[in-house]
Design a protein with these regions (language model features):
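Conserved beta-strand positions in repeat-built beta-propeller and related beta-rich domains
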Residues: 100-103, 149-152, 200-203, 255-258, ...
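Bacterial N-terminal signal peptides
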Residues: 7-18
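Short glycine/acidic-enriched loop and turn motifs that connect beta-strands
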Residues: 105-107, 154-156, 205-207, 260-261, ...
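Short loop/turn segments that connect beta-strands within beta-propeller blades
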Residues: 112-116, 161-164, 213-217, 267-271, ...
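Beta-rich, blade/repeat-based domains predominating
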Residues: 43-50, 77-95, 126-146, 176-197, ...
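Blade-level signature of beta-propeller repeat domains, shared across WD40, Kelch, NHL, RCC1
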Residues: 332-360
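Surface-exposed loop and turn segments in beta-propeller and other repeat-based domains
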Residues: 33-79, 121-130, 168-185, 217-237, ...
């Protein structure tokens, strides 16, 4: 989660888009209080990770008083992986269980829709592979319940069994970066198709999206040139930081081009279809219902720390809510978002060190 400074020109666009989105209203989405129900002594993130929420809110208030966008720089960019507290990503399974990829004592925490903790793991050495929670960035759950966890700074992805006590597969080479069939450079997002094929956004070091089969065999990639660190572009199938992605019922892929301020749409074989512009937004994650058949997505937008409900047909924002802050319904680095089969939305705050659930 590397923060990119927003230029004054884009800041104007952000404010314009924010005003437009605000006119749409919140779509009737309301915060569910006290979700999830963390057991006594449990917490998300690093217990003593600075700066504390009150300090961040004071920084944001000072920026607002100066007429500067609080969301653009209210939270300082971390110097390294161990200084990023909180929740790096969310995933959801076929039973609507919410998987929290947590940079803390329990790297993976699983909750039911009522907010009860039902499983936790990833906090030990598994099959000789040390899992480091401070390196996490995102994850996914396949249709058999296996869990995929991106350890970004180790340049690898590990597949765990449903009980989270066995490593089944590794993609990438531990601590070795690259842009070929067996290496990543700071991978950022992942999705798994019904046939087990795996799509990875290899976005912080490289600029490519990669398709693997269920065994981890490289099939193809989509990128400008070789998809390396210098291979940025704004054309179809090119990227300026591919970040995260989601899949609908037809297994259409909606992939965030974070610094390109757009979604790129592909079929399940990574054939390009179209683009959905999200100008005025800094999209970090996208959530589509596990059923994936209602034609809408939810965007975690870091520009002004909001959630947008977006029509996948025409790209129009139909609802929006949130702002920079640590109060109810506010966000501080909203970096993960998922939607359950009943339409409830779950949004994760990295620096807020919490998850918020919204229903209507």
């Amino acid at each position: 989660m590397r923060h990119t400074f927003v230029s004054s020109t884009l800041a104007v666009l952000f404010m314009f888009a924010s005003a437009t989105a605000h006119a749409q209203g919140d779509g009737g989405y309301q915060l569910v209080p006290n979700w999830p129900k963390l057991p006594a002594g449990e917490f998300f993130g690093l217990k003593n990770a600075p700066p504390p929420p009150a300090e961040r809110e004071a920084q944001a208030a000072a920026r607002r008083a100066m007429g500067r966008p609080a969301g653009a720089a209210a939270t300082p960019n971390p110097a390294g992986p161990t200084s990023q507290p909180g929740i790096s990503g969310l995933a959801i399974d076929a039973q609507d269980r919410i998987y929290v990829f947590n940079r803390g004592a329990k790297p993976i925490m699983v909750f039911d829709t009522a907010g009860n903790l039902v499983l936790a793991g990833g906090d030990q050495e598994l099959n000789g592979k040390k899992l480091n929670p401070n390196w996490q960035h995102s994850g996914a759950v396949d249709w058999e319940g296996n869990v995929y966890m991106i350890e970004r700074d180790a340049h690898r992805i590990v597949k765990l069994n449903p009980k989270l006590d066995k490593v089944l597969l590794q993609l990438g080479t531990t601590d070795v970066k690259g842009n070929d069939a067996t290496h990543f450079d700071l991978p950022s997002g992942i999705a798994v198709l019904k046939n087990g094929n795996i799509i990875v956004t290899d976005g912080y070091g490289n600029n490519r999206v990669v398709l693997f089969d269920k065994t981890g065999k490289f099939i193809k990639q989509v990128a400008k040139g070789a998809g390396g660190p210098a291979d940025k572009g704004n054309g179809p199938g090119e990227w300026v930081l591919p970040h995260k992605l989601a899949v609908d019922a037809q297994e259409t892929l909606y992939i965030i081009d974070r610094e390109g301020h757009r979604l790129q749409v592909f079929d399940k074989n990574l054939n390009y279809q179209r683009e959905i512009a999200v100008a005025g937004s800094n999209p970090w994650d996208i959530g589509i219902s596990r059923k994936g058949d209602d034609g809408f997505a939810f965007i975690a937008d870091h520009a002004l720390e909001r959630v947008h409900k977006l029509s996948l047909k025409d790209g129009k924002v139909v609802a929006t809510w949130g702002k920079q802050g640590i109060g109810p319904g506010e966000f501080d680095w909203v970096h993960g978002i998922v939607v359950d089969s009943k339409g409830a939305v779950y949004a994760a705050d990295t620096y807020g060190q919490r998850i918020q659930k919204f229903v209507r």
